[in-house]
Design a protein with these regions (language model features):
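Eukaryote-biased recognition of intrinsically disordered, low-complexity regulatory segments
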Residues: 1-11
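N-terminal cofactor/phosphate-binding cores enriched in small/glycine residues
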Residues: 11-69, 81-82
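Fe-S ferredoxin-like electron-transfer domains
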Residues: 48-150
Length: 150
């Protein structure tokens, strides 16, 4: 694991052993949204919510970037304003029975939609709707609530 100094939004941030740039960003106290990243699983990088821009203008998912000494990134540039649209696209194809969902009140999708000011969805739901699989006594799987995290 690498060790060094990164610059995040102009802030000098030391790192020592963090496995990706996302971990360094969070260590710096910056709230970086993610849907598909879980530290104990392999990196997928599909949700595109944790995108950052480096000093050369390259955009990449911070969860899949290794921290490097001297790396300079920005977390909130004009080119990174796509997060709101990603949320709208997820909500367009998402089952909207929030009041009966067990995650209501602690749902990351709800929290981020509120945080990014998504009040209405401009896109049509074009995905097929699936039956709920409640064949297991322990797990109920509702594929209509999938957020395509991987």
């Amino acid at each position: 694991m690498a060790k060094g100094i990164m610059y995040i939004d102009g802030q000098r941030v030391p790192f020592d052993g963090e496995k990706n740039v996302l971990a360094v960003i969070r260590k710096a106290g910056i709230d970086m949204p993610t849907f598909c990243y879980y530290s104990d699983l392999s990196v997928y990088g599909a949700c595109r919510m944790c995108m950052v821009e480096d000093e050369k203008g390259k955009i990449d998912a911070s969860c899949s970037m290794e921290p490097k000494d001297g790396l300079r990134i920005r977390t909130n540039t004009a080119r990174l304003k796509h997060r709101r649209m990603i949320l709208e696209l997820l909500l367009a194809s998402h089952c909207r029975d929030c009041t009966t969902c067990e995650k209501n009140g602690s749902c990351t999708l709800q929290r981020l939609a509120l945080q990014f000011g998504v009040r209405r969805v401009r896109f049509q739901d074009t995905r097929p709707h699936y039956d709920i699989d409640d064949s297991s006594p322990a797990v109920v799987r509702d594929p209509n609530k999938c957020i395509l995290c991987g």
